[in-house]
């Protein structure tokens, strides 16, 4: 019994001890767990503190970098941002991560976010620098473009001035353009019929040149003399410029004067007050034959080659276009000035140019000289040869009768010279004849719309 009770007590005691042990074990586990919880909470607090410190550091670094970039922009110094902050921040982050044992994953994530924030801020700084540099470049470009624009304006104006100067400095001292080529050809042909060589004088308008008042001279009869006295004194003739020819024939029986006004040409330019050139009229006429009457021509002289006169023509047809350039070698000719005084004639007759040509042509076949008699509006042409006499009469229908009694004007002239200048039907429709006793006969022929040609024919005594 004692044995049984002892075993029972031992068993009960062992049971009690086991329970106590279990209780002790449970208490130890609870303490361990609480300790672990405390450690975990401490580690979390450390992590939070680290995060806050890192965020404050990053914000401070961002603010400092922004202020530094602003000051650098103000100073306009283009310096790239330094990368030392990155390396230092990375080192600090590595040290802090090494010190913290727990929650390494969270800390590394926070480090990555911090690095990304800093890198973003630095990228923003670089973008700001790039933007500022771009703005500076655009400003400089605008300034340079503005300068270039002003320079281009100056260049454009200078080019215009140069073109205007080139119009005057084109190596030409004389330039004349006209479309009335046929009229010029007729004038030179008529002059070459009686004169072998002569001087051509080119003058600009409104210049004081000797005998300038003779350019606009006119001839009138005695009946209209009194009505024009006041106009002569008040309206002084001016030099209209243009082309002048005045020349005596070799026998001194005929004087030819041509006045072509500058304003009647399409373009007339003469850089000198007076240019006089000697020309062989036969050569000039033969060269002009190669040019059509309808082709426009340009007459010019070069500054460096004043021994030649150039004539250029351009003919444009539907089929083709042809251009001709003639260089006429000039001659040294003495050109004596021959004054032509204004004269009041006794009578003036206006005839149709073709009628005048037919009369001279028919009379020249049977006679060498012609006797011209004028009474009022009638003019008589008489020719005599060994076979007989021929008289042809023409009446001026537009003649105005004079108040004075009838006057008879009579003179004998050489038919050859009259016939040469009677071929003027291509120049004008009518011809004017001025007559006066014991004075040269004057023919006034209009040269289309360019000017006039005056022919003075001296009378022959007793028909010899």
UniProtKB/Swiss-Prot annotation:
Residues 72-92 have a biased composition (Basic residues). Keywords: DNA replication, DNA-binding. Residues 97-138 have a biased composition (Acidic residues). GO terms for molecular function: DNA binding; DNA polymerase processivity factor activity. Residues 1-168, 210-239 are annotated as: Disordered. One of its GO terms (biological process) is regulation of DNA replication. Pfam families: PCNA_C, PCNA_N. CDD domains: PCNA (cd00577). The keyword Cell inner membrane does not apply. Residues 41-71 have a biased composition (Low complexity). Sliding clamp subunit. Responsible for tethering the catalytic subunit of DNA polymerase to DNA during high-speed replication. Belongs to the PCNA family. This is Probable DNA polymerase sliding clamp. It comes from Acanthamoeba polyphaga mimivirus. The lineage of its organism: Viruses, Varidnaviria, Bamfordvirae, Nucleocytoviricota, Megaviricetes. The gene is PCNA.
């Amino acid at each position: 019994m004692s044995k049984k009770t002892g075993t029972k007590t031992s068993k009960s005691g062992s049971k009690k001890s086991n329970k106590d042990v279990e209780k002790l074990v449970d208490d130890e586990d609870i303490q361990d767990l609480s300790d672990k919880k405390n450690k975990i909470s401490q580690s979390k607090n450390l992590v939070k503190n680290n995060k806050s410190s890192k965020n404050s550091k990053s914000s401070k670094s961002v603010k400092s970098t922004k202020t530094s970039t602003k000051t650098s922009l103000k100073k306009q110094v283009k310096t790239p941002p330094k990368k030392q902050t990155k390396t230092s921040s990375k080192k600090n982050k590595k040290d802090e991560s090494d010190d913290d044992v727990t929650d390494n994953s969270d800390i590394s994530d926070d480090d990555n976010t911090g690095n990304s924030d800093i890198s973003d801020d630095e990228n923003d700084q670089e973008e700001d620098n790039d933007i500022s540099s771009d703005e500076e470049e655009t400003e400089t470009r605008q300034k340079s473009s503005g300068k270039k624009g002003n320079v281009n304006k100056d260049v454009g104006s200078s080019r215009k001035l140069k073109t205007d100067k080139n119009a005057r400095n084109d190596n030409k001292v004389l330039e004349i353009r006209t479309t009335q080529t046929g009229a010029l050809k007729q004038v030179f042909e008529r002059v070459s019929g009686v004169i072998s060589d002569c001087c051509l004088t080119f003058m600009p308008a409104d210049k004081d040149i000797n005998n300038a008042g003779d350019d606009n001279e006119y001839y009138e009869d005695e009946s209209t003399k009194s009505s024009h006295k006041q106009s002569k004194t008040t309206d002084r003739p001016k030099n209209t410029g243009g082309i002048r020819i005045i020349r005596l024939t070799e026998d001194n029986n005929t004087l030819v004067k041509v006045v072509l006004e500058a304003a009647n040409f399409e373009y007339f330019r003469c850089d000198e007050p007076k240019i006089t050139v000697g020309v062989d009229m036969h050569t000039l006429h033969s060269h002009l034959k190669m040019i059509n009457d309808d082709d426009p021509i340009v007459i010019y002289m070069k500054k460096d080659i004043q021994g030649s006169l150039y004539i250029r023509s351009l003919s444009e047809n539907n089929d083709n276009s042809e251009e001709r350039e003639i260089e006429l070698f000039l001659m040294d000719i003495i050109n004596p000035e021959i004054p032509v005084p204004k004269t009041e004639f006794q009578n003036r007759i206006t005839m149709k140019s073709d009628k005048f040509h037919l009369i001279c042509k028919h009379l020249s076949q049977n006679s060498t000289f012609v006797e011209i008699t004028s009474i009022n509006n009638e003019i008589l042409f008489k020719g005599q040869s060994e076979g007989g006499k021929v008289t042809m009469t023409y009446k001026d229908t537009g003649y105005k009768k004079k108040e004075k009694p009838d006057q008879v004007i009579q003179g004998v002239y050489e038919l050859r010279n009259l016939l040469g200048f009677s071929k003027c039907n291509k120049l004008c429709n009518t011809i004017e004849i001025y007559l006066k006793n014991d004075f040269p006969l004057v023919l006034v022929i209009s040269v289309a719309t360019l000017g006039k040609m005056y022919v003075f024919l001296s009378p022959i005594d007793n028909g010899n």
